[in-house]
Amino acid sequence: MTFRDLLSVTFEGPRPDISAGGSGAGGGAGAGAGAGDTASSESPAVGGVPGAAGGGGGGSVVGAGSGEDNRSSAGEPGGAGGGGEVNGTAAVGGLVVSAQSVGVGVFLAAFILTAVAGNLLVILSVACNRHLQTVTNYFIVNLAVADLLLSATVLPFSATMEVLGFWAFGRAFCDVWAAVDVLCCTASILSLCTISVDRYVGVRHSLKYPAIMTERKAAAILALLWAVALVVSMGPLLGWKEPVPPDERFCGITEEVGYAVFSSLCSFYLPMAVIVVMYCRVYVVARSTTRSLEAGVKRERGKASEVVLRIHCRGAASGADGAPGTRGAKGHTFRSSLSVRLLKFSREKKAAKTLAIVVGVFVLCWFPFFFVLPLGSLFPQLKPSEGVFKVIFWLGYFNSCVNPLIYPCSSREFKRAFLRLLRCQCRRRRRRRPLWRVYGHHWRASAGGGPHPDCALSAGAALPGAALALTAAPAPSSAAAPEGQAAGAGRRKPPCAFREWRLLGPLRRPTTQLRAKVSSLSHKIRAGGAQRAEAACALRSEVEAVALSVARDVAEDNTCQAYELADYRNLRETDI
């Protein structure tokens, strides 16, 4: 059963002055069927849908069609007599609308409103929450923008055409509407393709991801994405389409063979191939990396210390060159932190799982349409019936409605952001620098002393209001140290303490999850024993920089990458 079968609409003829309605004198009803049978009708048939007219003063006429035009049939409604109600239809203004058409209209209106509201929530969630403003979420916002444009500018006219049974907005606007439809759908699909590539980079290079995928690169990628979508959608506007039908009440996507194949390849099959390859790679990398990290954590558990936190103080004891205050850090000794790497990788893998669900739903929604469209253009005898095609076509539209519903079900961050928006708790704070920022150079592990002390946090020392006790980090083993420096590898630097400063800063209304992450982090960044240091390292006002050092790879000659804690007094849960 199609949308056309669910509704019946007909224009009324000149309404005579009748005192008695219903089936009174002169009243009667005629019916026109889409198969070609007519009853006392002189209305022409358009798109395979003949008109029907009924005589008398109180009758109403139902005209239904079952054309094979695949996007929309343009049946011309028959004429009807004056007021009254027959077989569940009622006169509303100049139209006689059935109860089924009202139900279909209400359903489609709810469908469109859900899509608009859901995509608006995604956009506003990222705009109102600084911790959600990441490159990956920018791609998600672009996906929501494409779906929002589709829901707000295309779907209302598609729904109107389904309810009325014909296109009522003119030939010129039909061409524009079809082009915007292709533009938004192509941009949505290409956004999912971009997201899959972004997730592969995030999982494959989780520590170097901020340096690889910058905001400037993301903006260039999005500009290219919309340019490709625009090129695909401009074909019919430039004449790459079938001959224009004479009746302006017919409007549908072009079935010209060349354009159907071209648009299907560019809008679906090539992006889908990239998506499938990227997520297969994500699965392989995630499985191998998880195993190696778990094995590394087991090995590290048996070691006494690992340096994670680096605090550089002004005016501290200098190295051999006696140059205090230098920001350089070559020659500092520290171990790798597999625990931090595992934490960061697990977050990337979780985001990849969420977006894999989005991509799976996308394939289920769009594959039937992009399979049927070129097939019907190449082999007209294989065209599906109108009812089957309409279900397939609106299934593609359904993808724009379901994407915003996936995020709160699989992402607690988006769920909390949605709830805050629904409670009108959008509080945009001033822009700050990212909490973790990549240095422009690498730090090489060695046993030599540096211009600043190398401090690490003692376990259990990050208590609110308490002085922060720090102990010096031991040098790495002789096997990890450069050749010729094994003698100094076993020496420990003098202990240092850092007082009157809170590592995690003042937290406003911390959630249970945030407290758990804070507790976990305070135990992960530790070195040596829990003994408290005696000498003061610096006061809070003397802090120059706080950095997190993470090993990249043993095969890279123990080169390490440092992440700077730019604003340590405002720590967010997603920054841990």
Curated annotation (Swiss-Prot):
Q: How is it modified after translation?
A: Palmitoylated. Palmitoylation by ZDHHC21 may increase the expression of the receptor and regulate downstream signaling.
Q: Where is the lipid attached (S-palmitoyl cysteine)?
A: C424
The record's subcellular locations are: Cell membrane
Sugar-bearing residue positions: N70, N87
Q: Please give the GO cellular component terms listed in this UniProt entry.
A: plasma membrane
Bias (Gly residues): 21-35, 48-66
Q: Where is this region: Disordered?
A: 1-82
Give me the Cytoplasmic side stretches, as residue ranges. 127-138, 198-218, 281-353, 411-576
Q: Which InterPro entries match?
A: ADR_fam (IPR002233), ADRA1D_rcpt (IPR000363), GPCR_Rhodpsn (IPR000276), GPCR_Rhodpsn_7TM (IPR017452)
Spans within the Extracellular topological domain: 1-101, 165-174, 244-256, 379-385
Superkingdom per UniProt:
Eukaryota
Q: Which Pfam families match?
A: 7tm_1
- Protein keywords: Cell membrane, G-protein coupled receptor, Glycoprotein, Lipoprotein, Membrane, Palmitate, Receptor, Transducer, Transmembrane, Transmembrane helix
Q: Which PROSITE patterns match?
A: G_PROTEIN_RECEP_F1_1 (PS00237), G_PROTEIN_RECEP_F1_2 (PS50262)
Residues that span the membrane, as ranges: 102-126, 139-164, 175-197, 219-243, 257-280, 354-378, 386-410
What is a biological process (GO) this protein takes part in? cell-cell signaling
GO MF annotation, one: alpha1-adrenergic receptor activity
The way this protein sits in the membrane is described as: Multi-pass membrane protein
The entry sums up its family as follows: Belongs to the G-protein coupled receptor 1 family. Adrenergic receptor subfamily. ADRA1D sub-subfamily.
Quaternary structure and partners: Interacts with FLNA (via filamin repeat 21); increases PKA-mediated phosphorylation of FLNA.
This chain's function reads: This alpha-adrenergic receptor mediates its effect through the influx of extracellular calcium.
This chain's protein is named Alpha-1D adrenergic receptor
Task: Supply the source organism's classification.
Answer: Eukaryota, Metazoa, Chordata, Craniata, Vertebrata
